[in-house]
Amino acid sequence: MTDNTTAPLYSLRGLQLIGWRDMQHALNYLFADGQMKQGTLVAINAEKMLTAEDDPEVRALIDAAEFKYADGISVVRSVRKKFPQAQVSRVAGADLWEELMARAGKEGTPVFLVGGKPEVLAQTEAKLRAQWNVNIVGSQDGYFKPEQRQALFERIHASGAKIVTVAMGSPKQEILMRDCRVIHPQALYMGVGGTYDVFTGHVKRAPKMWQTLGLEWLYRLLSQPSRITRQLRLLRYLRWHYTGNL
């Protein structure tokens, strides 16, 4: 019988990535034995690996996260190339967040939301409650001052949240999660970037077929040609992949 509550680790450029077979495996792992895992979830794609290579602060933030998983198809292919026996699949962060929220709603797990524009955050809360009856115990939009951070951490701690999701983009969200965990370590933290915008329909995600083919990056590039400079950086990652330098 396959064990769905544990998962192997695979090393790419020194980063230890969790090898989830599929979304159900990820959920069973995070909710093992009816207990929500505690720690920080960080989605890893090729761009984030490049940033971690060049920025020691980002590298330290990622290294400190307990649950690093393959969000990008390039990373999945690299794991499979380096470890031919690996049964690992892409788990998109946006999809994982929705599945976590659905599971949290089913089990009554308390959730705290951070980030996004005020109106987007309000719509996210309303939709989560309507769709999955999520127990949202608090929220804070992304427009707060540095001197308000400590008060936010105290609010999160007082709320008793077991899941805290932060939509502020990298590395801001990773920094906030790291600092908040000092005050409130008894939760699963997840950085979700622009997920609230996608969830509420403010930003259109790539059609399912593009996602299935691993071409979500191309869809975003065609939709936003200004991303070309960011995409050209990925040539360095391709060199790592094809020269076996992972």
From Swiss-Prot:
Gene: wecG
Entry similarity comment: Belongs to the glycosyltransferase 26 family.
Biological process according to GO: enterobacterial common antigen biosynthetic process
Matches recorded under InterPro entries: UDP-ManNAcA_Trfase_WecG (IPR023085), WecG_TagA_CpsF (IPR004629)
Functional summary from the UniProt entry: Catalyzes the synthesis of Und-PP-GlcNAc-ManNAcA (Lipid II), the second lipid-linked intermediate involved in enterobacterial common antigen (ECA) synthesis.
Keyword Transferase: yes
S-S pairs: none
Lineage: Bacteria, Pseudomonadati, Pseudomonadota, Gammaproteobacteria, Enterobacterales
HAMAP family, sorted: WecG_RffM (MF_01001)
The keyword Glycosyltransferase appears for this protein: yes
Protein name from the UniProt record: UDP-N-acetyl-D-mannosaminuronic acid transferase
Protein species of origin: Citrobacter koseri (strain ATCC BAA-895 / CDC 4225-83 / SGSC4696)
Keywords per UniProt: Glycosyltransferase, Transferase
